[in-house]
Each structure stands twice: as structure tokens, then as C-alpha cells.
Amino acid sequence: MGSDWDEIKRLAADFQKAQLTSTLQKLSERNCVEIVTLLLEKQMLEVVFTNDGKEYITPDHLEREIQDELYVNGGRANLVEVSKTLNVDLSRIELLAERISAENQSVHLVLGQLIDEDYISHIAQEINEKLVQRGEVSISELASQFDLPSDFLQHDVVEKHLGKIIKGRQDASNPRVFFTQAYIQRCKAKIRGALAAITRPINVAVILQKIGVQEKIFYSLLDEIAPAGQVTSKQANSQYVPHIYAKTQADWVNSFYKQNSFLEYDAIQKLGISDAKSYIRKQFPNEEFLYLKRVALGARLVELTVVTALNECSATKQYLDLTTILPSNLSEEDIEEVFSTIMAQKHSNPSNFVYLDGIVFSQPYLAQLVQPCQALAESQAKAAIDGGVYQQYIVEKTLAQKGNVSTQELEDEGKVDKRDERRKKASSGKAGGGAQGRETKTKSTKKHQRGKAAAQFDSDDEDDAQQGSRGGGGASKKAVKPLELVKTADIVKLITASLEEEGLEHLSKSIASLYTNQFNQTALARAQELFEATPQTNRRQTHAAIQDRINTLLIDIRLYEKGLKLFPQDTQTQLVKYLLKSLGNEICNELSLYVASECNLTVKNTNLNVDQRNKLAQECEAQYRAALLEQNKALNKSIDDFELATETVLKTCSMIIKKVDKKKDRLLIADHKKKLQKQLLECNEPALLLHLAALILFTTITGSILHASGKFVSAILQHIRGSLNEDQNALLLRYHDLVLQVLQAIPDSNESKLANEHLQTMQNQVVELAQNFSRASISKAD
């Protein structure tokens, strides 16, 4: 202490001596500037000018000034601030700072700042204090706090003083984190206590939130703690599952399986187990399971219960209700999946069983159940043959397979030709006509005796040209709808009674649908057998029927010819033409279809026009072709020509023409008149009533029958006019005029209503005249 005081005294004396000593020579400021400039030019002196250029300083002195600033600022100086303080360019300051840090190992140049060891020791002490307070610090936090690079802080500050000034340790998993041993012990105690208190699965995030421990520390200390549980993963949604809970889960699963021999995935998932199948495999490594979509069945339940019951069902030829042997909480989908899986895994033949809504039927049981359907198929096949349904199906099928019928021809055959329709109406035709020769359009009458068709009002010959001009397009096949002889409803009726006894009537439709196609095919096969077994018998019956039919029509034509010959020549010509177009056309159709059948040709529609018959004749065998074509041509000639042509066709068909028996003519005429009178009594339409009345009066007066359409009514009334008295003629003429008035008037108009009222009043008189008129009345009139 004394030596220091002596040194101070010595320095004070030197300072006083310097102040009292005078210089030998004083220089002016200008001289000083010139001297310094000269020294600089001769590079004998190096100085650093200030920013304003008024002052200069040597580099060594500037270096001392920088070190002084570092000391003044506590060991950390920003070079920018030093540059401002010393008024020296920043670049000169940076160069000197680099030299200082290079020459002095205790000084560091970091991001434009000079930092000495004193400052580093100071912040190390601060870091230690913070570590003591918080127990854990990270380099990133320190870098933010001290505004220093993280690498500098970690290597030159923390790691350098770790264990010396900084009392802590570095995290092995994260080198940028440091903590104290006391902090680690506190965290370990928190984690151990929290995990010990948990009895059910809980998210790790919840645990960390409750105890205030960081996730990385939790996972790093978890293995050291050895908790009574396990963490599912280290992901964000990881859970901690205590061993006590896992044991409880295992106990519940084992108990449930022991009692029920199956496990539900949903029930296991409710226990907190996400992958139920994996858990079952892990929990029961030595057990075999049948894994379904919703449940896992144990091998004991499958082998001893289900498989055994199925074998018994097959042996006894009965059915098995799976719902009675499987757990009650299984759905229908689960039960069906059990059956399907067993069939696949146990190598059973699925064809031995039929599964329907939880019920497994053996094939023998179902075969016995539907046995009565064999008789049903037999009866349906016979009915199809007797009714001609199967024959029609064969025709359509053959036609579709050939594919040689044009589209337009199919359309033509599907449409009813106007002329053919008129020829199939009642022979009395339509009512109308009058003394003035006006035509009237009315409805047709009904058929007369022996099935002869009556005709409608024949409009004109243009219909013939239009019908004959219809042509066909290209060939096309037409799909044929499969014939259903046995339907599902038929089978349901037969099996419902047997199923009701077992309480299974709700499955009748499902079972019937399984066998509908089988029995329908059986019925079709049986129908084919019947069809093939009776062709000759059917052919003989068809030959006889056609022969009788043609002879009947020829007799009708002969009788009608007698009646039409009573008219003038021009009217006769029209009546002959109409007669041939109706009854003659019908004869041609009958013979053409018969010949087509003999030649094994298929015809879809039996109502043929002239063109269609000609095309059909071209396809027939040569022995029939010429006769059929000639008969078609004769329709436009006389009745005698047509009869001769028809006889030729009959001979080619080996049919006999019956001899004329004139004794029966009067009976036929009387029978025809009775038919017309019956129709008249049932008729309420004025136009048709007048038509029938005219035909009846003609037959009564002439003793002949007449085949005429509605347009000939006026000619008929004119012909019988002389056989009636004035009142009768006036009645018929007045009635005829009223009919025309109704047809020409607007429907529901006053004129139409008034005319209908008059017609209604006169109707009984016209009916009475037609019904009661006799030859005696003719004599009285004369």
C-alpha cells in the first residue's frame, strides 16, 4: 500500500514539472499543418483523419481509443456507435477492430460488434441465473434476449462456461437446450405422479398441459421413469394407456369371448382399441377366428355349432334357421356373411343349400316343396297347345330367326286393312242411302249365320290402290318376347300352404322366383313334345275344317248372287265387286294360309291383302303357286270366274267340293232372316237400324238374301218401293232423311237433337214394319 502511494506522489511531481517547464520554440498552427503534410508526403507518418477533416490521429492511438470505448461500454461495443463517437470512418474502425480481435484472443468480433471475455463472463452469469430460475433455457431464447448469433452463444458462451459459471447440463436429444439437474428431477417427479394417477387412456397433450412439462422433456424422461403404462406413439394425437386399463380391457375381452365365443369390433373399439382385428390376434394368438365385417367368430362356435347344424340339415333334408344358433345381436348381413364364408372356407358345396333371409334350405327340402309344380307345368303346357298360344309363339320365333320379312311388311300385317275389315263385318253392311242415292256412313252389323262376315260401307276403289302400293323396307329381325307358361304367382299359390305350417310364408315369393325359370322351361319342353306329337292329327283336323269353311262360304256366295241379280246391271256390278272383296277375300285368305302351313311357311298375321297373298304364293311350292295367283286375279272378275278358280285351288289341296242341295236354301235364307231380326231388336242406332230393316224387308219381299254395304241402302229401298204402300214408303223415306240430317249436322246442335228425337219416335214403327211385314202384306198392297 505504501509503494502505491509513493508512485502517486512521483507522478504528481512529474506532472507539476511538465506544467512549469516552458518550450524551447513555439510553432504556429500553420507551421504544424505544413510539417504534418510534409511527413505524410514522405510517408514518414501515418494518420487517420476525422470525418470532418479538421482533426487527425495515428492508427495506434485510434486503436487505443477503440479499446477504451470497448472498456467504457462494458466489454461490448457496436462499431457503428464507436464510429460516431470517435468521428472516424466506419471502414477504418472495422479494419482496426479486426486487427484487435486477431491480436487479442479475449476479444471477439461478432456481427459488427466487439465483445471481450469480461462481457462473455457477465452474460454467462445472467444465463446461469435464468437457468436457476426457470430450470431450462434454449439457445433460441438466449439469442433473442442478448441479440447475438445462436452459434456464438452456444459454442463461445454456454458450452465454454458449462459446468463452471453455468451450472447445468446439455440435453442429449437437443444440444441447443440446457437445463439444471433440479429441473429434471422436478419434471420427472411431475411425470411420475401424473402417470401413476391415470387409470384410463388419455391424450399425452392433456397430461403435458396439466403438469406444465414440455413434450420433448416428457418423451426423454419417459423411459427413465418406467411408468405403469405405455404411450401409443410420439405423434400429435398419441395417448398414454395405463397397464391397469389394458388389463381391464383384456379381462373384459377374455370374459366376453369365453361366454359368447365371438367378439364384436364395435364393442372392442368402445374400449378404446382402434384396430380390433389386430388386438384379437394379439390377445388370442392360439385361437382361430372367422373374421367377418362386424364380428369375429371363434372356431368353437363355427365348428361345433354352425357347421354341425348345416351337416345335420343336409342329412335330414330339412331347413335350418341360423338366427336360432347364432348370437342374437348379429344382423341379417352378419348371418349371411357367416354362411357365405363357411361355404367358401369349409369347402362345402353351395349348391346343396339355398340361403334366404337367415334361413338355410337344403335342396331336397325345396325339391319336395315344389314337387306339385311339375303337374302345374304339365297342365300349363297342355293349355298352351290347346289354346294355340304355343303355336303362335313358335311362329313368331321362327319369323324372327329367319329375318326375311321387311319392316314395312310387318307394319302392314300389324295394321288391319280397311277392305279386309269391311269384309269381316256383318253381311248387312252399314245403313244409309235413300231415293236420292245419297251415301251414309254407319257402323257395321253383326255376323250372320255360319260365321259369314258382314261388310261395312265400301268407300271406293282408292283404298285398294293405297293398300296395294304399300312396300317393304330392308329385312330386319324382330325380337320375340319369351313365352311364360309358368309364372311366379302360380308357384306361390302352390307352396304357400306348406310354408305357412312352418311359419315361412314370407319366403314363398323368394322361393318361387328361384324355380320359375326351371318350371317354365319344363313347361315349354313339354309343350314342344305335345306340339311335335300331334302334327298329323292337327293337320287332318285343319284340312277338314278349312274344307267345310270354304264350302259354306261358296254356298253363301251362290245365295247372295241370286239376290243381287234382282237389281239393275250397274248396281249388280257394284254388288258383285263388293261380294268378292268381302267373302271372296275371306276364301282366298283361308286357302292361302292353309297352303302356307302345308309348305312350312310362317305368316305372322292372318289378315292378308292381295299383295301379301301374291308374295306368299310366290314362296309356296309350284303345285300351289299358279292356282293361288289365278284365284287372286279372279277377285276382280265375275263370280263364276272366282268359283272356277277356287275349285282349282281346292283340287290342288285335295279338298272336296260339296254338291249343291237346293232343298236347304230356304232353310238357310230363313235362318239368315232370323239373325237379322235378332240384331234389329238389339239395335238402338238409327243408321244401323235402317240398314237392317232394309235387308229384312228385301229378304221378305224377294225370298233372297243380299250381301250389301251401307251405300246400297238407297238402292234397296228403291227396289222394294213397289212392294210397300205409301205410308210404309213415306215412313222409311222420312226415317232415312232424318238419319242423313243427324250425320250431316254438328254434334250436340239443336238440329241434331231435334232429328234424334224424331228418330226415337219413329224407331218402333220401323222395327215393327220390318219384323211383321209378310208376303200377305205384299198382295194387299198390290
UniProtKB/Swiss-Prot annotation:
Arranged from A to Z, the UniProt key words for this protein are: Transferase, Ubl conjugation pathway
GO biological process terms, semicolon-separated: protein ufmylation; response to endoplasmic reticulum stress; reticulophagy
Report the EC number(s), separated by commas if there are several.
2.3.2.-
Xref: InterPro entries: Ufl1 (IPR018611), Ufl1-like_C (IPR056761), Ufl1_dom (IPR056580), Ufl1_N (IPR056579)
Q: Does the keyword Ribosomal protein apply?
A: no
Identify one Pfam family in the record: UFL1
Record region (Disordered)? 404-478
Single Gene Ontology MF annotation: UFM1 ligase activity
What changes when the gene is disrupted? RNAi-mediated knockdown is lethal. RNAi-mediated knockdown in adult neuronal tissue results in reduced adult lifespan and progressive locomoter defects due to neurodegeneration, when in combination with knockdown of Uba5; brains show evidence of increased ER stress. Neuronal cells in these adults display defects in autophagy.
Domain of life from the UniProt record: Eukaryota
Cellular component aspect of the GO annotation: cytosol; endomembrane system; endoplasmic reticulum membrane
Function noted in UniProt: E3 UFM1-protein ligase that mediates ufmylation of target proteins.
Family to which this protein belongs: Belongs to the UFL1 family.
Q: Which PANTHER family match?
A: E3 UFM1-PROTEIN LIGASE 1
Could you identify this protein by its name?
E3 UFM1-protein ligase 1 homolog
The protein's organism comes out as Drosophila melanogaster
User: What lineage is on file?
Assistant: Eukaryota, Metazoa, Ecdysozoa, Arthropoda, Hexapoda
